Amino acid sequence: MRCDVVVVGAGPGGSMAAKTAAEKGLKVVLVEKRQEIGDPVRCAEGVSKARLSSMIKPDPKWIASEVKGARLYAPDGSNVVMSEDKSGDEVGYVLERKIFDRALAMDAARAGARVMVKTRALDLLRANGSVKGIRAMRYGEIIDIEADVVIGADGVESKVGRWAGIDTALKPGDIEVCAQFLLYDKGIDDEYCEFFLGNELAPGGYVWSFPKGEHLANVGLGVIGSRSEPGAPVKLLRRFVERRMPEARIVEMVVGGVPVSGPIERTIADGVMLVGDAARQSDPITGGGILNAMQAGMIAGEVVADAVSSGDTGVEGLMAYEKRWRESIGKQIARHLDLKEFFIRLSDDDLNKLMHSIQSEDVSKMDLRGMLRVLIRLNPKMLWELRHLVM
């Protein structure tokens, strides 16, 4: 089989890359190792309304609910409320990822991409030292898919990057180990996402609740890998639910890992590009990665079209991708990495003090940067080293 570009992984980033490249006239193959795209769901499913709408038209079929904003809780229960449009990239719509991911893959197919499920990439094909496609297993048969460029959108455990010689290694402190329940509870607030901080609740991470309507919610937590033990996230999550939602009924459970390392040093090689979690483009504070992956996927699709058209699919031909995604989303990722590294060092007493300090402030219309500016003003001794983030 021969094509211009093969995309490995049909998550949001991979599907957007495939769709964009196909719209530019390339012959595209999108492969997915699972037989059902979007399943299992491994995230809280929240996205910003404005940012999502800037990339695709929202469709009620894949929107589970809309929220008014977010509540952020300190360990002692004190909290602040932020409006939806100021709460970051994970608050606004709560998606049905199983439907959403398939819809994005269908959009890629409508644009002209060939979508191949139950197709697992096994290795890269090489010719004269250059990457020229992938070898894959499909329905028990080994197949070769020749291509000028391989886009690796194969998630946190990306093999494409490793095969291409890109260092994608993660240290324990670079990953949040997560567990999540889809549960029913009459006490779920269907209008607000909720975030709970505290080292007793989730060491180096936080607990989240994303309402999906009719008192269903994704309730989960992440624990920084360097402070986790086998099975700890599930145990901690069960304890949280038992204490806060004793009448809850668990419908589904998923576990996984999210990179919070900040971007890897390079996301391209000769004939190879990495997108989304494979490139460590998720937000280091929240772990959210849907929108960053989609934006990076669109950039990758545009750049690969130019590279194939020019006949230069080596590092120089793909360098525009590296530059464009770092300029558009990389700066915020870098700022949030600094914040993450600082806040995971704080004690619960520190977190309580910070929350108490802004109780009298109207933060409902502040974004994260604005809130941080106020916190630094009110707590200069504790937060002075973060002042460069709000300059």
Swiss-Prot record:
<feature type="binding site">
    <location>
        <position position="13"/>
    </location>
    <ligand>
        <name>FAD</name>
    </ligand>
</feature>
<keyword id="KW-0274">FAD</keyword>
<keyword id="KW-0285">Flavoprotein</keyword>
<dbReference type="InterPro" id="IPR054715">
    <property type="entry name" value="GGR_cat"/>
</dbReference>
<dbReference type="InterPro" id="IPR050407">
    <property type="entry name" value="Geranylgeranyl_reductase"/>
</dbReference>
<feature type="binding site">
    <location>
        <position position="289"/>
    </location>
    <ligand>
        <name>FAD</name>
    </ligand>
</feature>
<protein>
    <recommendedName>
        <fullName>Digeranylgeranylglycerophospholipid reductase</fullName>
        <ecNumber>1.3.7.11</ecNumber>
    </recommendedName>
</protein>
<keyword id="KW-0443">Lipid metabolism</keyword>
<dbReference type="GO" id="GO:0071949">
    <property type="term" value="F:FAD binding"/>
</dbReference>
<dbReference type="Pfam" id="PF01494">
    <property type="entry name" value="FAD_binding_3"/>
</dbReference>
<feature type="binding site">
    <location>
        <position position="97"/>
    </location>
    <ligand>
        <name>FAD</name>
    </ligand>
</feature>
<dbReference type="Pfam" id="PF22578">
    <property type="entry name" value="GGR_cat"/>
</dbReference>
<comment type="similarity">
    <text>Belongs to the geranylgeranyl reductase family. DGGGPL reductase subfamily.</text>
</comment>
<keyword id="KW-0560">Oxidoreductase</keyword>
<dbReference type="GO" id="GO:0046467">
    <property type="term" value="P:membrane lipid biosynthetic process"/>
</dbReference>
<comment type="pathway">
    <text>Membrane lipid metabolism; glycerophospholipid metabolism.</text>
</comment>
<dbReference type="InterPro" id="IPR002938">
    <property type="entry name" value="FAD-bd"/>
</dbReference>
<feature type="binding site">
    <location>
        <position position="32"/>
    </location>
    <ligand>
        <name>FAD</name>
    </ligand>
</feature>
<feature type="binding site">
    <location>
        <position position="44"/>
    </location>
    <ligand>
        <name>FAD</name>
    </ligand>
</feature>
<feature type="binding site">
    <location>
        <position position="46"/>
    </location>
    <ligand>
        <name>FAD</name>
    </ligand>
</feature>
<dbReference type="GO" id="GO:0046474">
    <property type="term" value="P:glycerophospholipid biosynthetic process"/>
</dbReference>
<comment type="function">
    <text>Is involved in the reduction of 2,3-digeranylgeranylglycerophospholipids (unsaturated archaeols) into 2,3-diphytanylglycerophospholipids (saturated archaeols) in the biosynthesis of archaeal membrane lipids. Catalyzes the formation of archaetidic acid (2,3-di-O-phytanyl-sn-glyceryl phosphate) from 2,3-di-O-geranylgeranylglyceryl phosphate (DGGGP) via the hydrogenation of each double bond of the isoprenoid chains.</text>
</comment>
<feature type="binding site">
    <location>
        <position position="43"/>
    </location>
    <ligand>
        <name>FAD</name>
    </ligand>
</feature>
<feature type="binding site">
    <location>
        <position position="277"/>
    </location>
    <ligand>
        <name>FAD</name>
    </ligand>
</feature>
<dbReference type="InterPro" id="IPR023590">
    <property type="entry name" value="DGGGPL_reductase"/>
</dbReference>
<keyword id="KW-0444">Lipid biosynthesis</keyword>
<dbReference type="GO" id="GO:0016636">
    <property type="term" value="F:oxidoreductase activity, acting on the CH-CH group of donors, iron-sulfur protein as acceptor"/>
</dbReference>
<dbReference type="GO" id="GO:0045550">
    <property type="term" value="F:geranylgeranyl reductase activity"/>
</dbReference>
<feature type="binding site">
    <location>
        <position position="290"/>
    </location>
    <ligand>
        <name>FAD</name>
    </ligand>
</feature>
<dbReference type="InterPro" id="IPR036188">
    <property type="entry name" value="FAD/NAD-bd_sf"/>
</dbReference>
<dbReference type="InterPro" id="IPR011777">
    <property type="entry name" value="Geranylgeranyl_Rdtase_fam"/>
</dbReference>
<feature type="binding site">
    <location>
        <position position="121"/>
    </location>
    <ligand>
        <name>FAD</name>
    </ligand>
</feature>
<keyword id="KW-0594">Phospholipid biosynthesis</keyword>
<dbReference type="GO" id="GO:0016628">
    <property type="term" value="F:oxidoreductase activity, acting on the CH-CH group of donors, NAD or NADP as acceptor"/>
</dbReference>
<dbReference type="GO" id="GO:0016020">
    <property type="term" value="C:membrane"/>
</dbReference>
<keyword id="KW-1208">Phospholipid metabolism</keyword>
